[in-house]
């Protein structure tokens, strides 16, 4: 069976609130770490979220 192209990743908030999003990315085309600006409801602001592994 072939290895799937997309993998699940965890986007951790850089505001150190412990909030995270779970999303997918294509591991073959996006080899670098993903950094997105998304909404963190704990601090009620848009902050950067950096990619981390799902445990």
UniProtKB/Swiss-Prot annotation:
Gene Ontology CC: one annotated term: cytosolic large ribosomal subunit
InterPro entries reported for this sequence: Ribosomal_bL33, Ribosomal_bL33_CS, Ribosomal_bL33_sf, Ribosomal_zn-bd
Molecular functions (GO terms): structural constituent of ribosome
Record flagged with keyword Ribonucleoprotein: yes
Pfam families from the UniProt entry: Ribosomal_L33
Top-rank taxon: Bacteria
Coiled-coil features, chain-numbered ranges: none
Keyword Membrane: no
Protein name per Swiss-Prot or TrEMBL: Large ribosomal subunit protein bL33
Source organism: Phenylobacterium zucineum (strain HLK1)
Gene: rpmG
